[in-house]
Amino acid sequence: NKDEAMALAKRGQDVFFKIENCKKPIVAAVNGFALGGGCELTMACHFRLCSENAKFGQPEVNLGLIPGYGGTQRLTQLVGKGKSMELQMTAHLIDANEALQLGLVNHVTTAESLLERTIDILNVIMSKAPIAIGKIIECVNVAVVSDSAYTNGKSGYDKEVEAFGDCFVTEDMKEGTTAFLEKRKANFQGK
């Protein structure tokens, strides 16, 4: 019935919202098909890599449905209104190169090097200040969401000012600036 369907969609949105707003980076590595809920899951991740053989799509309209776990919103945020409408209304699948061109994925690589490339990027991110990484995630997410319940009525700029202040008083900021002045690699502790 309708109430059960709405509850299912709400639960899915809640799970994907937690992924999207996790303070630690979550990166999707897609090797094969990411359709329907799978595509919605990848879009909830902070960014996406895929192999050359990846395919993406929101084919729910073929079942008389629409994406229910935030896909109508995230796809539009990532690829723009017109292309989002087209992909959802036609159920057209796109390949890795088109996904890259549209901004749905950040990188395309071979299937053999997909995991290695993903880990390389994550290792770079892990070498940065973890509190700052979490604040970047918060600020970027506020920039693409207009829901005042999510943003607590703050603009993205307001959130950025607050997050900058939060980072400014951390031990990581002291370590980062000291390391810069001493011309050495920073050793961030997440404090």
Task: Locate predicted features.
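CoA-thioester-processing core
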Residues: 14-21, 29, 35-89, 102, ...
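Glycine-rich phosphate-binding loop at the start of an alpha helix
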Residues: 6-13, 36, 66, 93, ...
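An acidic, glycine-rich surface segment that forms the CoA-thioester-binding/catalytic face
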Residues: 1-31, 158
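Helix-capping/helix-break motifs at membrane-protein junctions
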Residues: 1, 80, 110-111
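Short, basic/aromatic-enriched C-terminal tail that caps enzymatic domains
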Residues: 176-191
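A general structural signal for well-ordered alpha-helical segments in protein cores
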Residues: 5, 12, 72, 81-84, ...
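C-terminal long alpha-helix characteristic of the crotonase
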Residues: 49-54, 96, 105-159, 165, ...
